[in-house]
Amino acid sequence: MISPDKQYESFTNLYNPSEIEKKWQLIWTENNLYKTDELTENSDKFYALSMFPYPSGNLHMGHVRNYVITDLIARFHRFKGKSVLHPMGWDAFGLPAENAAIERGISPSVWTKQNISHMRSQLKLLGLSVDWDREFATCDENYYIWTQYLFLELYKAGLVYQKESEVNWDPVDNTVLANEQVDSEGKSWRSGAVVEKKLLKQWFLRITNYADELLKDLEKLDNWPERVKIMQDNWIGKSIGTNINFNLNTNPEEKITVFTTRPDTLFGVTYLAISVNHSLIKYISDQETIQDIENLKQYLKNNKNNELEKIGIKTSLIAINPINSEPIPIWVASYVLDEYGTGAVMGVPAHDQRDFEFAKKNNIDIKQVIINDKSEKTNELDKAYVENGYLMNSDQYNFMENTIAKLKISEEGVDNGWAENKIQYRLRDWLISRQRYWGCPIPIVNCKKCGSVPLKQSELPVALPKDIDISANKINALGDNNHWINTTCPKCGIAAKKETDTMDTFMCSSWYFLRYPSSKCSNKPFEKIEINKWLPVDQYVGGVEHAILHLLYARFFTKALRDNELFEIDEPFKKLLTQGMVQAAAYKNNKTGKYVSPSDINDLSNPTDPIDNTKLEVLFEKMSKSKYNGIDPESVIKKYGADTARMFILFKAPPEKDLEWGDTDVEGQFRFLNRIWKLYINCAKDINSKSNSYPDREKSLIKSMNIAIKEISNDILNNQFNTAISELMKFYNSLANSINDVNNTLKIEALKTFCILLAPFAPHIAEEIWHLIGFKKSVHLEYWPSFNAEALKEDSYELVIQVNGKVRDKVKINNDMSEDQIKELTLKRPNILKWTQDKEIRKIIIVKGKIINIVV
């Protein structure tokens, strides 16, 4: 890259980041500095990727942290000589854009594209080493045509199906939510509305077909945070157990199946509990019981977001325990879920705390069948006994260890036809149907004669209609657009209708990382050869909030498309970094529960509410408008420069921890960059003039330089960016203290090395000072320096002197001293003479580099 036409003949001590950053960003763009190099057989690759943003319209500090971290990693590996792919795109479909467009009375497409344009310009202010030629948005037709294509690939593989089911309905956003999009309080992850149940015909993906592989392959992800793997493990929720069939006493042909991981407690079953929608409900004839069940249904619906009472309704139904033929009463219970297992559970109050509490409340028998010790007698329990032990009250299994009895009772059940070994998962198939406009249309035609018919690739894309009606505070759903919906069946040719559901936005983000290596490919979603070269992503960076949704779906997509022979990779992301939140001080009035804007507070060191003079609590919380603690990245960049913002973000906290914003810390990084600027300005004035040369100073600088190279390299590889900057500061101090006392060759080498080490963190100022000291090509085209291990060796070491095993003195020893010289030196020391004088020295033991022990 050619240096800009500028002569550094007159220098200023003023560091002007705005001028420097604009200049270099323009030059980098003009020279295609960050265009991805083609991979060859001999080149190493590195694929660095941030989770792509939703184009909300404005960059926030959480974005800045995410993209600066990824950029640092990408730059480092480019310096290491690798071909780096570092792209950017936009997760552009979804309800927020649709709702924002409705509020403004414009098309979601227009709104989204405006936001993308603005956010792109904001991102470019950060000086990211992104290959912008590969940019796309998921709402682009030339992207979502391939989302539709991949949907059809999964359809052909039998992984897509449609069924009528009770779904999670968001009454505010008027759409269906996947289980993963409903929080623990039963509220929508997006709108916060209490989720309702509704019966609709929906499209699903069979993610459960991959449950076992998704679980097992977590073991391969050595470079993922353990907490993310645990979250996925728990969400998949594998249980190994037994399905046990209980016959109804009034109808022996009718079975009630329960899943249990504790067949050893089968003799202790004193009731069965079923859900309010279980198929056995039809056998209940008592009208009072039926009404109680209806009331319980309403209670469950109204209290979806609350902790449920353990409500039970005893029915007239009786089951028969298959192992001992005892009659077992059947209850309808509030805690039994329709969607998990069989919708029925066996109640063992003596050995399950939930069952124990339910039994106590409803006066159900409690029968203990496991004891801690064979000689122990049963007493009335005050809580469930849940430990291992020995069976009792269990016929031929009495006194058998319960861990063995589990297997034996299961075997008896399987042999006699009333049990089946079963693996069960908490994971449910992925519901992808959404009843809104702004999403990827599903490429299916509904025909009265042929049913649901998938389109051919040649008939794609099914494009969203542009003639939309924005009225009555909503955009009409696709089903209301007669011009768009009416079509002909691709199979039989009669009049038919397009599918009116759109896809969950996670469909688009489950494969976007596969598009970047061949983003301009026009006849398929990606080039197989490019996927096999570039994937998996070497470093993926994003928030832990995506641990279950996006990351699990992306893993599923990768495995499903692999099985369709579209590529050979098993996992999409080799290394995952989940960065913490960016927090800032928020001022809360605990009396009113309201937050107060810092601009309304007279004294931030002693904050009080200007309205009622109440002392305010200072909390560090995630930045948000409602808490008045948001920091605008553009204003920070305007005041201090992008390099300062980058340095602060990287230095303030380890990347996986939450970061607390502090103006003082930002100013500290700005001052550090100013000191660097002044040092290089002064050096540039007489870069070729001879300096005084002091060997001790030179040796010290060489050592500092090599320590910096070694430590910063290791810190970046280990995502310890804050300690890397600390090492950079140490090297700067050594450089500044000795720069005028070393020979010219070392001076230039040290200045050059510091510049390269600084460049991934603060790329603009590094580029500027690189050219200040006379280099013509970009610093970002240099190679990362290697450290010299010899330079790190000490000339001397501290030797501990012992007399009869007790420490009596310490002395500095040169590395080149012989054992005889060491003995002579230590024996002459006053502190040693007083312990050895007039005594016989029997033996001297030397552990080289550590200890000398004189035995007297």
Swiss-Prot record:
<dbReference type="InterPro" id="IPR002300">
    <property type="entry name" value="aa-tRNA-synth_Ia"/>
</dbReference>
<feature type="binding site">
    <location>
        <position position="625"/>
    </location>
    <ligand>
        <name>ATP</name>
    </ligand>
</feature>
<keyword id="KW-0436">Ligase</keyword>
<dbReference type="GO" id="GO:0002161">
    <property type="term" value="F:aminoacyl-tRNA deacylase activity"/>
</dbReference>
<keyword id="KW-0963">Cytoplasm</keyword>
<protein>
    <recommendedName>
        <fullName>Leucine--tRNA ligase</fullName>
        <ecNumber>6.1.1.4</ecNumber>
    </recommendedName>
</protein>
<dbReference type="InterPro" id="IPR009008">
    <property type="entry name" value="Val/Leu/Ile-tRNA-synth_edit"/>
</dbReference>
<dbReference type="GO" id="GO:0005524">
    <property type="term" value="F:ATP binding"/>
</dbReference>
<dbReference type="InterPro" id="IPR025709">
    <property type="entry name" value="Leu_tRNA-synth_edit"/>
</dbReference>
<dbReference type="Pfam" id="PF08264">
    <property type="entry name" value="Anticodon_1"/>
</dbReference>
<comment type="similarity">
    <text>Belongs to the class-I aminoacyl-tRNA synthetase family.</text>
</comment>
<dbReference type="InterPro" id="IPR009080">
    <property type="entry name" value="tRNAsynth_Ia_anticodon-bd"/>
</dbReference>
<dbReference type="InterPro" id="IPR013155">
    <property type="entry name" value="M/V/L/I-tRNA-synth_anticd-bd"/>
</dbReference>
<dbReference type="InterPro" id="IPR014729">
    <property type="entry name" value="Rossmann-like_a/b/a_fold"/>
</dbReference>
<dbReference type="InterPro" id="IPR002302">
    <property type="entry name" value="Leu-tRNA-ligase"/>
</dbReference>
<feature type="short sequence motif" description="'KMSKS' region">
    <location>
        <begin position="622"/>
        <end position="626"/>
    </location>
</feature>
<dbReference type="InterPro" id="IPR015413">
    <property type="entry name" value="Methionyl/Leucyl_tRNA_Synth"/>
</dbReference>
<dbReference type="InterPro" id="IPR001412">
    <property type="entry name" value="aa-tRNA-synth_I_CS"/>
</dbReference>
<dbReference type="Pfam" id="PF13603">
    <property type="entry name" value="tRNA-synt_1_2"/>
</dbReference>
<dbReference type="Pfam" id="PF09334">
    <property type="entry name" value="tRNA-synt_1g"/>
</dbReference>
<dbReference type="GO" id="GO:0005829">
    <property type="term" value="C:cytosol"/>
</dbReference>
<dbReference type="GO" id="GO:0004823">
    <property type="term" value="F:leucine-tRNA ligase activity"/>
</dbReference>
<keyword id="KW-0547">Nucleotide-binding</keyword>
<dbReference type="GO" id="GO:0006429">
    <property type="term" value="P:leucyl-tRNA aminoacylation"/>
</dbReference>
<keyword id="KW-0030">Aminoacyl-tRNA synthetase</keyword>
<dbReference type="Pfam" id="PF00133">
    <property type="entry name" value="tRNA-synt_1"/>
</dbReference>
<keyword id="KW-0067">ATP-binding</keyword>
<keyword id="KW-0648">Protein biosynthesis</keyword>
<feature type="short sequence motif" description="'HIGH' region">
    <location>
        <begin position="53"/>
        <end position="63"/>
    </location>
</feature>
